[in-house]
Amino acid sequence: MDPPSLDTAIQHALAGLYPPFEATAPTVLGQVFRLLDSGFQGDGLSFLLDFLIPAKRLCEQVREAACAPYSHCLFLHEGWPLCLRDEVVVHLAPLNPLLLRQGDFYLQVEPQEEQSVCIMIKCLSLDLCTVDKKPVPEPAYPILFTQEWLEAINSDFEGNPLHNCLVASENGIAPVPWTKITSPEFVDDRPQVVNALCQAWGPLPLEALDLSSPQELHQASSPDNQVLPAQSLAKGKGRTYGSKYPGLIKVEQARCGEVAFRMDEVVSQDFEGDYVALLGFSQESRGESPSREAGTSSGCTSGALEEIAGTKETPLFQKILPLSEANEGPSLGNRACTKPESSEERPYNLGFRRKVNLKAPTHNSERPPQGSYMNVLEDALDCASGLRAGVSQEPAASKMQGPLGNPENMVQLRPGPRQASSPRLSPASPAAAASETKIEVKTKERNGRLPKPMPCPSRNTSSPEPPTPGLKFSFLRGQRQPSVTPEKASLQHNGPWKVLCSLYSPKPNRAKSLGKAGTTQTKTSGPATAPSPLTEEKAALPEASAGSPERGPTLEEEPPGPEPRIGALGVKVFRSRIACLPGGRDRAGRPLLLVSTTEGAWEAPWCTVSEVTKLLSYLCTIPRPEDKAKGLAVLIDARRQPPQPGLVSALQATQAQVPASIRAILFLGEKEAALQLQTLPDVQVEVLTSLKALSHHVDPSQLPAVLEGPFPYCHTEWVHFFQKLDPFLADLHQASSLLQASIEEFEKADPPGGMQEATRCLSKSKELMEAVLRDPGLLGLQREGGATLARLQHDASRLDFSPDVRSHLAAATALYSLVDEQLHVLVTASNSLLGKLELRVRLGRLEAAIHQVSDWMEQEGRRCLQSLTPKDGSLETVEKAHAEFENFFLQAAAQYRRGLELSKQAAQLGATARGAGEAERAEFPELAAFASTQRAFQAELTHFYMAAERQRTDLETLLHLHRFCKRMTWFHMDCQDLMAQLRLDKTSRVSPGDQRRLHRYLQRLASEFPAEKLAAVGLQVASLSRAGLGQELWEEARIRHEEIRMLLEKALTHSSCPEAPAAHSARPERRGVAAKGQGVSVEVTSKGRWDQPPLDSLGMDHLPKSYWPPGPPRGEQNRTFQAGSPPQEAGQAAEAEDGKGSHKLPDPAREHLLATTFFRQQPPRQSQVPRLTGGSFSSEGTDSQTSLEDSPQTSPLASL
């Protein structure tokens, strides 16, 4: 599908869904832009096929079902239920979630699978933090816009009931009660007015009338008044039309379950090319003009429309009221309906049809401010974010309305290779251009020139003009702004051009918010194919300034050349018919310049030699270049009146100003009157006394009616054509020169290599592009260039007998296409340069960030790794080193994550570079160097992080080993306490309770310190990065574990196999010696019992403190046994044995073994160590301590 057809299809679909489209365009286009950019990557064809067409089918199905109960009603809002005037109800893109409140929801059409869509209902979730969405089931579509549907939704909804639906307009997002949306409004409150209207006017369209005033209605219905009642609309411009019926549409009865929308019939009725206004629609309360409204819909029946289509046409120039140059009052063209050949050939958009009144400007004329379509697109961007958008308005006392009735005036969504271009000026179909060509032009005040249309009484035709080919310029078309203030320019900076670049640029994010209103010009160096024709002027101003208006600072402006400009001519002398160029040729092929001496204008005070010279000089520049080379043949008609003396002087001045422009003079008159002409140099003068003699030099078929020839010529139409053509060509030339200079600026040099230079060049390039796109001339062409060209083509169709008109129109068309191509080339060149500069800036920033991370690793990182290397030491030393390393590791991890992100960005940049062509990669040799830098940095980053992780693991392993050994020591001390309590040296048999305690300790040894765990700790120690680290500590823990096991096992064996009493009493002195050798003070009481020595006398203070950290004294545990105060059970057993008189002493050998085992040097016990978590080798729990039942004081032996 070619781009124009794609644009037309998209715009027709949108206009059909959301009429009137001019009212909904800001919102809908904003949503389309966001969806096209986010979901379809700027691919307009995929957007159309995969989303818009299925969405259109679905929405039409919903609309038909909603409208079915109102088949005989006339809707106040023709877009119901999808939109309410300018408020969009069913959205195409998600809204800003921050605007949702409890009880609010909105409906959105979302794409599903390929070429399928569904309607989603979206509202706040229960936590009010996210947006929940739920698809509307297909069976619910027929009842979607009913109160019952929402009640069914609320019955299944857990949160607050939904009651407000969010609608979007150019004013922002607003909640509307669902009851209001589901209750359509109808036009049924003024039936008597409508009936009176139909009786008085029959098939007259309702939208042409203002029903607010009975006097105006009576005046409109007057038979002798030839001005349609639309004049009352212009007269009542000061009133508010908010209570009228905007956008009427008739819903006719169709088949069962189907509603027929007869918009196409209404739209296809073209009132001689005039844009039909909506009935009484205005937004003056919002600062907008009725001329800004769109959407033609008639309240009459289809039969009335057909009757309108069958009415006899009246030529446009017969319907224009005569204008008086002295008093230029308001006038309106009488409108008649014409029906085009077929609705298929004339694709109109309902929403963009405008009313254009033919009205001469007056100094005291007051009009409401009119917003151009540029403002509509600005609002579309603001509405895309769901926020309030201020619409900037321009006062337009006398503006030319650009035609917005065509889809070509809308957004062009271009797929394929031309996406890199900016808005295109591509040709439109002839049928599509026909809607632009039939235009009743408002006079406009532009560039200091006030236009004034003139009637043409000689033009009388009753058949409509055939459609003529037309062109279009992008979708930014509307009213030409006469001036743009700096404040306006700043407001427009982020306007539609950003959207344009995002749609047309190969890289959507490359568009850099280019402005729309600026002050830049350049030298005029475009193709000099045609002179600049006439500018419209007001009759009260005899002359207007030549050239274009001031546009602020220029790049390098040069004068357009020595050719006379139409702006230098007086309007009166130009229209006076004293000289004209009908288009005929003499027999030598030279253009005929007809000079009449009978016109009364020769006597007017404004008809001076200077003015006539300007006129003749300008006319000499009109013919084609090949005809100008032959020179002109001036035919002077002096049959009734001899020429004025000033004519000869004007001819001489013209010949001097434009050398060789006049080659022959054919003087039709008396010979005596031509004597003065003989003085002209290099000019052949032929005096002809009759028309028959003239036929020898000029074929009679080449003579106009004033010389009794059949050659068709209407001077007024010819003047109007060149008055429109000349400023249009001047703008095209200037725009072409500006674009060409900008293209050369972007393509002249390679981007700089350094990051700072690239940043400066990037900023300058953006400023240059912004200045170009803010040029008022270029903006004017974007808004109304296509419409102007279409009007020129329409006017040229009535002047197609003139080869000069045809050549100028062809030149304008070619220049228009050239500007379009230059605009495309400029955007491509700008994108290319900006891409290169952005790549270099990104490379520089990435390199700087990479160097920063690399420097941190080399300096701070390496220093901390070296200073916090794991070493053998006490528990406090290891814990301190571990805590410091954890703080350092947080910094290292942050740097590592930053390095990973930089590596990811570098990889993406490399992938982008690899995806580019060989030529582009060759332009960036630094990409190869950056790739090697990125690989080296990634390797360094990985190595550093692995080293930090390894060192962290070593510290955690060492810390875990210390804590494991500490728990082993506590358990060993508990075993010593147990042995001291049991007094195995004193009794020959151990009670069953003591045996159970020994068994429990063995079970604790097996559960808390199993062999598997001991082996795992050994493997962890062996895995340390430095050989020998922690080995000594591990060996001591292993030996301690073996000692505990052997001690418990021997004690259990001793309790099960007691020794003979004699064996215990054989060598009491030896036990005492052994105990004394261990530093233990053992005393025998009077009853012969062995007392337990105090715990402090076990020699624990003499333990080396290399690995076992000091702890608090164990006084709080109160495990010291005082002499003479043994545990209760042991005392009772001893007393029982004393009572029996069988006192036995322990075996000295066994006592010596127990003493040496129990009284090994032990460190003071510490308080409970807090558990540390987070490491890979964290402690499994608190340190092993004696449980409550094992505590010597809290759990005495009697409790067992």
Curated annotation (Swiss-Prot):
Biased composition (Low complexity): 420-435, 1160-1171
Highest taxon of source: Eukaryota
A single GO molecular function term of this UniProt record: guanyl-nucleotide exchange factor activity
A single BP term in Gene Ontology: axon guidance
Disordered: region residues: 282-302, 323-372, 392-491, 510-568, 1056-1200
Gene3D superfamilies recorded: 1.20.58.60
Stretches with biased composition (Basic and acidic residues): 437-448, 1137-1153
Cross-referenced InterPro entries: Rho_GEF_signaling-related
GO CC annotations on file: cytoplasm; extrinsic component of membrane; plasma membrane
Segments of skewed composition (Polar residues): 518-527, 1175-1200
Protein name: Uncharacterized protein KIAA1755
Lineage, highest ranks first: Eukaryota, Metazoa, Chordata, Craniata, Vertebrata
